[in-house]
Amino acid sequence: MRLSQFHLHTTKETPADAELVSHRLMLRAGMIRKLASGLYTWSPLGLRVLRKVEAIVREEMNRAGAVEVLFPTIQPRELWDATGRWEKFGGQLLKIKDRKEQEFCYSPTAEEAAAEFARQEINSYKQLPLNFYQIQTKFRDEIRPRFGVMRAREFLMKDAYSFHLTDEDMAREYDNMRAAYTRIFTRLGLDFRAVQADSGAIGGDASQEFHVIADSGEDSLAFSTGSDYAANVEAASAAPPAPRAAASEAMQQVATPTQKTCEDVAQLLGIALQRTVKSVAVMTQAGFVLVLVRGDHAVNEIKLAKVPGLADYRLANESEIREHLGCEPGFLGPVNTARPVRVVADRDVAALADFVVGANVSGAHLVGVNWGRDLPEPETVADVRNVVEGERAADGGELRLARGIEVGHVFQLGSQYAQALQATVIDEGGKAAVMKMGCYGIGISRIVAAAIEQNHDDAGIIWPAPMAPWQVVVCVINPKQDPQVLAAAQALLDQLLAAGLDAALDDRGLRPGAMFADMELLGIPHRVVVSERGLAAGTFEYRARTADAAESLDKAGLFSRLGH
């Protein structure tokens, strides 16, 4: 391919509203152009990258035994009413009417369509298991589309739906898809983590997200240096605490007139922050609850909501705190409460001895507090905190925190969608059985942006080789002035293509500096320069995108550098 015959339009300027590096670089490289809020046209250059990602995803899905289909993007309200998601999905669901006033939605996902297709097509357990996947445009009516294609309203997605007779078979396919996703992101050359996750609005039991590691990621992740353990911070856990030590101090009240935070109290008393306990007052339908975490820890709201009886909790107001504890906020504690209260202690707090808590007296704290002596053992002990960088993981490694961009998600849905749409088969006993479903999504257009967030420098994109629009670009100096140089460059291009390399020829006639800057901006892994001087010496100027300098190579050396 000659770039003089290809549409390539790079720019130096980017709109002020392009916040993320990926958004700025995709605009500068001419990969995308904005059509409307959250809607982007993919240029020929951008589409080359998108199709390369799509091809790897398709190859690995086929390898895993999934079968490609194509569901309608416009889906009738009746299906979504049956599952309850017409209302539950919220404002992101774009609802439309046809000329007959029949209601439809532009699908953001296709569980309903897949379950309906399975209901029509699968009659017997002998046809199972089956896994249908599609690669198709989706639409979610984001309130504030931002970050370019990272959070666009329209996006390209691979979504797959598997059908099973038993939970065990559903779990096997879940593991099969996790393995396929690992192969996909490995082949794409991305630094990623598979993390335990919450199922969210889609629902289901087991759930795992795949995140590309990037400083700009919206999600906080924790992973261990000792194994492949990784989890979203909402689900991450550290190693259990050591057994509680014996009490060695007597409880006494100390004055803390202006010290309302654990940090201030620890500094006043000259003790480690880990010995202090933070008391968080919440209200539930059943009443007042005091949640205890160590002073150096923070309550994890999602974990806390999973504690029995706390699903609907909210923070208590000052009047509720005074009613139950008899003091103002800042001096709360589980000892000598004005009224009996339920105590939920984080497991690290339950393992403390000689700790410090608020005295339920304004301007005072208690030191030397011990469970079983100064207050009853906690009614509930649970992991209700966020993990901390560097602490010990359950596998013996250290926990590391990072930011991640979610690019894939796998779910075990169970029977909820199949039940709602009456997707049944005849089982071995001749009876109707509701099928089990799995759901597996990959954001293909999002992967492109995530890869740039992870791989760039001041000059532009640094594509992982499998995603680059071309692996090699042959750059010609003064092609119009020297036909011999252009002919030599074309001959080299033909040899590169014959060797199986995805290559192009830059014969646009730009000044060398501008041409080289474009190649760096576009993230081309290998740049080869053909010039009159080089031809005379029998060499080519070669530079890898990540190299500090160019080098002169003969043809054999060049092909060796390119792995051929």
From Swiss-Prot:
Its EC number is 6.1.1.15. It catalyses: tRNA(Pro) + L-proline + ATP = L-prolyl-tRNA(Pro) + AMP + diphosphate. The keyword ATP-binding applies. Its main location: cytoplasm. Keywords: Aminoacyl-tRNA synthetase, ATP-binding, Cytoplasm, Ligase, Nucleotide-binding, Protein biosynthesis. One of its GO terms (cellular component) is cytosol. GO terms for molecular function: aminoacyl-tRNA deacylase activity; ATP binding; proline-tRNA ligase activity. Consists of three domains: the N-terminal catalytic domain, the editing domain and the C-terminal anticodon-binding domain. HAMAP family: Pro_tRNA_synth_type1 (MF_01569). Homodimer. This is Proline--tRNA ligase. It comes from Xanthomonas axonopodis pv. citri (strain 306). The lineage of its organism: Bacteria, Pseudomonadati, Pseudomonadota, Gammaproteobacteria, Lysobacterales.
